[in-house]
């Protein structure tokens, strides 16, 4: 027993020179307490000194130096508390002593902060007061984190609380290495949960001003949510501020100061603008009043100083007023100068959301055109910073990417792809294409581009929106005042290209009167060019689309024309097949009728069986042909609908394809206008009548067909009659 006690004492002495975890230290303290009680009860203290040389001789490797003195913590409790360690202590770690009863050694409750069991309310911070009257700071004992790889080469590390999205708090191990802030969920993790670059950032210290608040450090990055960390005391906050200032000494940061002692009045103005325009952060917002702000470039550190009671009262009033102003400003946000647009920009906005292809991923970005540049922003509310800016001069606009993204268009410079953009609708795509064509300085007609992945109807919508935006943007470049200029209504055609806006032919071929009448959209039917001269009257003549001169007003839409021609040829082929089927069915029905009559005549004879077999085969063939005829009718109806859409879009596209009489679209706009030309109304000479006004293409397409000329009634009655005749036979 004596040898065991001596060996145990030596083992405990060796453990004194080793690094122990909190669990091992607790066990060591328990064993030491038991050993002291055994020694005091059996009186082994004297015997140990007598037998110590003998035991030492029995050891295989006796120590060459005398054993160290017994530490104070092994002595009875009457000798005093255990000594304090001299090693450096990490932040956020302490051991709390529990009151001891007589005859017992002190026990320690170790807090290693490695679990999420800690409450998000963080009440221990709320109970602290800065004055510290009658209180002593808790001593921080060393922890196992001090020798981990996580904190190696770290400038500072501590367990801090991070403010979450809905005001809750979560505990993280925060470490600053080089120029990064690494946040670990636990000291056992090898990968950080969050990594934040301290370049170009601003850090703000917000002291605790009530029991519901904490000492907070707010780290802000442009274009990202602020990171809010809670520290235990003002001293700890100053340490972190100093370290971050040293880390960012070679970087440029933004100033987020609200103090009256700021070195430049511009900083205060910028902060007030930011407070009035920024949205509430997901990590929570804290006011900067009575705070300390450190600029990341290390050149400036603004501190608020307490002054007299009068100044304190004025500060409180100022803080209250700012809070009220901020609450009111959340509902009514005054747009910044970047967000404000002129009245001309409101008509055709030069900004909007687009999907941008970046690193094989589609991301939604707020895009706007300004000063011949396409600027990408992360969000609509963040216009002070941009992700990338692309100069548009010299670029080429090409619609289409693949069939999965039909509303895509690309920007090319010298054959190299600069940007791939996707719109949300055909109108939006046309607006952006027209806008980019105008800003790039291109003389390409929006209708001359090839739209390979969208159908005819959508192509018409894209081209119409592109041409309107194209003319509008060029009109803004030519005339600073949209209501004053040499062109009609401020519209002009770029690079000497004639603008084909009204594609519907003018009735009777000319206008009567000195002034050309305006269309429904306020755009004159007379088309001018930038370099229009009196010597060339054909450049300013009105657009007249008839069968003779339709070829010269084509928009280069070879693909759309090919589709329409293909549909027409397919319709003709289906009509021929339908006619052949109809003749064959009529022949089969006649043969069937004759066979039935022959069976009635030859009833009871041997030939009746042969005739019945022929009748069965004939019935089967009739059913097959009838099913084929029904499928043919369905296919023909579908082709007619497609052809009708193609011919309706031909007005906007300027196609030289005309509907055939008696085919799918007898009520197409071209057919209607030809009817009007042959009607008595076309011979009227008054300039104020509706027949002499050129019709806008969009209005003509949106106009519902007249109920008097409905082509469906006779067709339905004819089909019903055919089915009745078939069922009757």
From Swiss-Prot:
Q: Where is this motif: SH2-binding 1?
A: 94-97
Q: What's noted about post-translational modification?
A: Phosphorylated on tyrosine residues by SRC.
UniProt cross-references to CDD domains, sorted A to Z: PH1_AFAP, PH2_AFAP
Q: Coiled-coil region(s) at which residues?
A: 557-648
Q: Where is this motif: SH2-binding 2?
A: 451-456
Q: Kindly report the protein's main subcellular placement as a broad class.
A: cytoplasm
Q: Where is the composition biased (Pro residues)?
A: 60-69
Protein role: Functions as an adapter molecule that links other proteins to the actin cytoskeleton. May function in facilitating interactions between SRC and actin filaments. May modulate changes in actin filament integrity and induce lamellipodia formation. Can cross-link actin filaments into both network and bundle structures.
User: Would I find Phosphoprotein among this entry's keywords?
Assistant: yes
Any one cellular component term from GO for this entry? cytosol
Instruction: Identify the tissues in which this protein is expressed.
Output: Isoform 2 is specifically expressed in brain.
Composition bias of kind Polar residues appears in 257-266
The protein's location, in the record's own words, is: Cytoplasm, Cytoskeleton, Stress fiber
Q: Which InterPro entries match?
A: AFAP, PH-like_dom_sf, PH_domain
Q: Where is region (Interaction with F-actin) located?
A: 594-637
Q: Motif SH3-binding located where?
A: 71-74
Q: What is a biological process (GO) this protein takes part in?
A: peptidyl-arginine phosphorylation
Q: Which SMART domains match?
A: PH (SM00233)
Where are stretches of biased composition, namely Low complexity?
113-123
The protein's name? Actin filament-associated protein 1
Q: Which organism is it from?
A: Gallus gallus (Chicken)
Task: Indicate the impact reported for residue 453 to A.
Answer: Reduces phosphorylation and abolishes interaction with activated SRC
Q: What is the effect of changing residue 451 to A?
A: Reduces phosphorylation and abolishes interaction with activated SRC
The ranges of region (Disordered) come to: 56-91, 112-139, 257-291, 701-729
Query: Which keywords describe this protein according to UniProt?
Result: Actin-binding, Coiled coil, Cytoplasm, Cytoskeleton, Phosphoprotein, Repeat, SH3-binding
